[in-house]
């Protein structure tokens, strides 16, 4: 098992963890229906950029 040679200082520890923060996912609003969805993904009702691209089961 790997064992460190020297103790990592608090500064270096913080730098190591600097990319671990969680961010909220970006959301877009569909211009025609007002549905909220992730950017570059279809909305839950099957619309993408104002066009119907997927037939949803409930319709």
UniProtKB/Swiss-Prot annotation:
Coiled coil: none annotated. GO terms for cellular component: large ribosomal subunit. Keywords: Ribonucleoprotein, Ribosomal protein. Residues 1-59 are annotated as: Disordered. GO terms for biological process: translation. Pfam families: Ribosomal_L32p. GO terms for molecular function: structural constituent of ribosome. Residues 49-59 have a biased composition (Basic residues). Transmembrane segments: none annotated. HAMAP family: Ribosomal_bL32. Belongs to the bacterial ribosomal protein bL32 family. PANTHER family: 50S RIBOSOMAL PROTEIN L32, LARGE RIBOSOMAL SUBUNIT PROTEIN BL32. This is Large ribosomal subunit protein bL32. It comes from Neisseria meningitidis serogroup A / serotype 4A (strain DSM 15465 / Z2491). The gene is rpmF.
